[in-house]
Amino acid sequence: MADYTHLNLLETEDDAAKHGMGDTLEAHFPREALGCERTGVSLQRIKPGQRLFGHTHKTDEEIYVVVAGSGTALLGDDRQELRPMDAVRLAPETLRAFEAGPDGLELLAFGTHHDDDSVMAPDAWSQRGA
């Protein structure tokens, strides 16, 4: 028998509100619902004009894919404009933060998964003159 899990990401729990970020985005982290053991995935729907805090990882590499909308990614000290179907690979130690354009920004994020691997950078934008 095939071993797989199928679900719709929009039907998973929106975790943003329980972390005080409901005004900024929807955030779906269906790793457990999918039964993932070594990988992670998330759907992040950033509201128009909103910025997400930055973060890095200790060991996890990530790939972000723009599903819809537009915006700007803060990647280390660089800024990269984003549009649908852009993909960005990030080494663990590279700072990443996102800002939605006027039409919002929807991202799928994929990566390896290790507990307690994230290092938050809440002042990423202001520390880089933005």
What positions do the PLM features span?
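A short hydrophobic beta-strand segment most commonly corresponding to one strand
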Residues: 89, 103-119
